[in-house]
Amino acid sequence: MSAQILDGKAIALELRDSIQKEVEAQVANGKKPPGLAVILVGEDPASQVYVKNKKIACEKAGFNDVSMVLPAETSQAELLAKIDELNTRDDVHGIIVQLPVPDHIDPEEIIERIDPKKDVDGFHPYNMGRLATRLPELAPCTPHGVMTMLAKTGIPLRGLNAVVVGASNIVGVPMALELLNERATVTVCHSATKDLPQKVAEADLVVVGVGIPNMVKGDWIKDGAIVIDVGINRLDDGSLCGDVEYDVAKEKASWITPVPGGVGPMTIATLLQNTLQAAYGVKA
């Protein structure tokens, strides 16, 4: 058996097209285009690529791009002041600070300073709390993008045994909450989990986001399982791979996300969707 591919790239393009049409309709009715401020502190090469991709996506969707690059030596106080300014601007509907930030910056304080109604990354404790109480507003982009991809593909989640490998606030924890809200039975695995291969082998659905190349071996995967690989890692030869051993896993799974072209495009599309919602109170 060879798995069917969960084509995040195609689903994301469909979603972005709907977002663009909604923006055109709102602007035609006299509304301002959605404004997204992406703040990059320093010159981390990977972050520069992510910010560039977000900028291109904004422009294609008809958004007002308010991206800015601040020097690496920017102080905590200076960054907080910039966020305060953006919080008050009525042409800015979404604010994100590209992570990671330099070591002298406290990311938790920065995230909490963003107006929760403009927190389109969904990382503010207010938005995480809304998700945890089944009242989501702006949900973290990667997990919500995964949920959109599964829904658009018609994969039912109710009653499935789901294993989330990784417990970060960016992916693992909100992913578990999203799955729980769809009535899956969820196990979260992390660095202290015992017998990870056995946990994975019992899963109908596996979501992996740890940032370690090929950490989850293909032969751990249960026959017919759904595999969502959130990881994207660059190897020494320049090639990209996920956190799951893809070539082996795809022979056992029923559905699997490729890397690249799986979860990544859905993350950016969901960021646009969150910004649209913050601007107009509607979803595409």
Swiss-Prot record:
Involved pathway(s): One-carbon metabolism; tetrahydrofolate interconversion
UniProt xrefs under InterPro entries: Aminoacid_DH-like_N_sf (IPR046346), NAD(P)-bd_dom_sf (IPR036291), THF_DH/CycHdrlase (IPR000672), THF_DH/CycHdrlase_cat_dom (IPR020630), THF_DH/CycHdrlase_CS (IPR020867), THF_DH/CycHdrlase_NAD-bd_dom (IPR020631)
Keyword terms: Amino-acid biosynthesis, Histidine biosynthesis, Hydrolase, Methionine biosynthesis, Multifunctional enzyme, NADP, One-carbon metabolism, Oxidoreductase, Purine biosynthesis
Any one cellular-component term (Gene Ontology): cytosol
Gene Ontology BP annotations: L-histidine biosynthetic process; methionine biosynthetic process; purine nucleotide biosynthetic process; tetrahydrofolate interconversion
Pfam family, one: THF_DHG_CYH_C
Catalytic reaction annotation: (6R)-5,10-methylene-5,6,7,8-tetrahydrofolate + NADP(+) = (6R)-5,10-methenyltetrahydrofolate + NADPH; (6R)-5,10-methenyltetrahydrofolate + H2O = (6R)-10-formyltetrahydrofolate + H(+)
E.C. number(s) listed in UniProt: 1.5.1.5, 3.5.4.9
Residues that, per the record, bind NADP(+): G166, A167, S168, S191, I232
Gene Ontology MF term list: methenyltetrahydrofolate cyclohydrolase activity; methylenetetrahydrofolate dehydrogenase (NADP+) activity
Matching NCBIfam families: PRK10792.1, PRK14186.1
Subunit structure: Homodimer.
Family: Belongs to the tetrahydrofolate dehydrogenase/cyclohydrolase family.
Role of this protein: Catalyzes the oxidation of 5,10-methylenetetrahydrofolate to 5,10-methenyltetrahydrofolate and then the hydrolysis of 5,10-methenyltetrahydrofolate to 10-formyltetrahydrofolate.
Protein name: Bifunctional protein FolD 1
Species of origin: Hydrogenovibrio crunogenus (strain DSM 25203 / XCL-2)
Source taxonomy: Bacteria, Pseudomonadati, Pseudomonadota, Gammaproteobacteria, Thiotrichales
